[in-house]
């Protein structure tokens, strides 16, 4: 079966509509960065500004993992459990409810199983249309009527952009050089790829800034060492 047929088969076992309406953030967070925490903040702001949607106060954040891609430690050095622990310990994910799933459809389906209904999905422009399409096609009312779903477009996710490895590495290294020179990095340049590369090069202070833990050096070092051991 192809991917669409697989989803169609899974659709047959979807739970009824959940009673708790949520805004959903889906990602690998490998590792979690200050960019991810900025996303959580943006989603919380959206929830506050749209009371008419009757959303839960905090976003549902689904950590993607558990599939074959986890075997590639270069891209996925931290386990799902480790990613969740680091985000909770950061103090930057207050009000967030964490879940895990192997892919986007499983994430939305799992939320329904737990009594949540995905109403808003937040993602970068590369992934957002696909997520919205899944929700609109498969996640309907119990009598088959359409549910109005909303998209929250976020700044580009560097890890989701398909570029040649050599070009991507050059861009990442250029950003890291700038970070070492002036100690600052623009939020739109932050990515999990940047954090992993900082570990590869031994840039521990820069890594702490990328992951938003420059004021929690103990936790930053623990994450740095975990990633270094896995690479």
Where do the PLM segments sit?
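Nucleotidyltransferase catalytic core that binds NTPs
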Residues: 2-231
